[in-house]
Structure formats: structure tokens, C-alpha cells
Amino acid sequence: MRIKILLAVGLLGALSLSASAQEESQGVTPEIYYLMSDFGDGMVWFSDQGPAQGKMNICAEDNSLRYLDKNGQEVVASSIDNVVKVQIDTAVFIRNEGVFYRIYPVSDEMAVAVRRDLDIQRDAQRGAYGGYSRTSSIREYSTLYADGVAYQLAKSQKYPFTVSETCFLYTGGKIVSLSKRTLRKLFPQRKDAIDAYLKSDRSLPDKLSDVQAFLQRLASGETL
């Protein structure tokens, strides 16, 4: 299989240089702003051509694919409509409806797919006492659970932001919701156990580690 080098001009359409990381991310740490903590050895798979490789990362704010050119400059791929899969180091991402999901295998047939949503509130205005009008000044990350989603609230150096990570399922080549209906369909032999679990005033897990453990118990026949 012939592998193209991602740095070839035109491979991903027109390319544009990004702003500096500090300027663009408005003080949000790389671990939050990107789906990987650093640019790593990556491979991109396309729907209409062979794979390509290079040093790359994925931006959580706009789901853009970023990579480093031969001078170490961060570059934004302006057209990635034909990208279906990305691997950076050992992490695998599936692109679905314009969003990258990180894949965490649970079995040969199923994986947890995690989507990160980052909202940098650039329109927030400073209040009279130096805070921001859209959120309080939070120095440490804190977790807020709402609608089954874990939200991390924080104040960046320039603007407040929120970041959430939501767990889905990846099975049969598709991203599907983590819901009672989906689980009953995927585990028909465990319908009664799923119903009993939810009727006992418990909700489906939303943290990655808890979702993985829950699916493993479902698959093995263990008590939920």
C-alpha cells in the first residue's frame, strides 16, 4: 500500500496557516483545546484515496485537522469532507457528520465513542469586579452533570469556556446513542437486566470508565 505524506500541498485541499496556539485557543490548555495533548505521528484515511501520514492533531473547538509542515508551523486542513478515520499515535478517531469521535474498544464488535465539545465564550464581557458576565471565575476545573453529559467549567486566561465529553457507542461502523433502546437492541438477551437496572432509580453511566465497565458486564452476563 502506497502511503502519501500529509505535507504534500493539495492533499487535503487548500491549506491555511493557523494563528498562534496562544492567540487562537485564548489561553485554553493544549490538553483541552486539542483531542491529543501534543502533535503525534498520525495517519489519515480517506473515502476516495489512499492514506496519508504526518505530525497531526485535532482541534476540539472546530473539529479541524491540524498538522505541522516541514518548518514546524501548524497548518489547518481547510477541506476534510473525505476524511473517515484518523490515528494519532495509538489513539483512533472516527469522523462522523463533521465531528471526530475517539474510539475506545470494548470488544471486537463494539467500542465507546467519545465526542468532546469545546465552547470558548469569546463574546463574554468582563464584569465590574474583573469577572465574566457569562460564568463565575473558577480557578480549578469543576464537574457539572446535566442531561447525562459531564461539563468541565473553567476560566481561561482570556475568556471563560466550557468543555463537555459525551459517550456514544460505535458498532457496525456507525456511531449510535448510548440509550436504553440501543442497549436493548445490542444486548437482546439482557433486556430484563437493563430494564431492572433503570427501574431501580439508576441512570446509564456517562463517564468513559463507567460506560466501559457497564458494557463489559452486559456482555459477560454479570449483574449490573
Task: Place the predicted regions along the sequence by residue.
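N-terminal secretory signal peptides
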Residues: E24-E74
